[in-house]
Amino acid sequence: QRQMCIRDRVLEADQQLKEMGVERPTHVFVQAGVGSLAGAVVGYFAHKYKDNPPVMAVCEASAADCLYRSAVAKTGNLVNVTGDLQTIMAGLACGEGNTIGWDILKNHVDVFASCPDWMSAKATRIYANPLGDDPRVVSGESGSVPLGFCFTALHDEDAKDLKEALKLDENSVVLVISTEGDTDPVRYREIVWDGLYG
C-alpha cells in the first residue's frame, strides 16, 4: 500500500512536469526521512532517463541525517543516528534508513545534504511569498527543505562550490519535491509571520 502511494506521488510529479511543458528536469531535489520516498523518486528518474539522468540531491534534517552519514562513511552500509533527533522537520526525524531505499540512493544520488532547520524555515517563507506569477505553496518544514537546499546552493556566497558541484546554472530545470502542508499551523505561522528560525 505504501509503495503504491509513493509510486503515485512520483507519477503525479512527472505528469505535472509534462503539463508545464518540461520534458526532462536537469535536477531533482527530494527530502528523506528513512529514504523510501527519496528512493522511489530517485529510482524513477534514474530509470526513466537512464542514458542521461538528472542531477539528484537528497536533503535530510541535520539532526537525523542517517543517509548523509551513510554516504560519507563510504562503506555502502547504512549508518543510524541515535539520540535527540530534535528538528522542526518532524517528518524527517527518523535516524534509521530503509534498506531498499538505500540500495537505490547509494547508486544514483549525486549529493546527500545534511540541512539545518533555518534552511527549511527559509524555504517555507519563500513558498509562502512567491515572486511574480508563481503560485503560493503552503509547505510544512519537512516538505520545504529541498527548496531550502537548492536556494542556498544558488544564492549563498559561501555555497559557490556546492552550486558548481550540482552544476546549477541559468539553464537548469529544477524539480523540488514537497510532500507536506502546514501540519502544525501554529508553527507554520511562527515561521512565516514571525520569522522563527530566520
Predicted regions and their residues:
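Active-site-adjacent helical/loop segments in soluble small-molecule enzymes
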Residues: 3, 97-166
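Glycine-rich phosphate/pyrophosphate-binding loop at beta-loop-alpha junctions
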Residues: 3, 7-107, 162-198
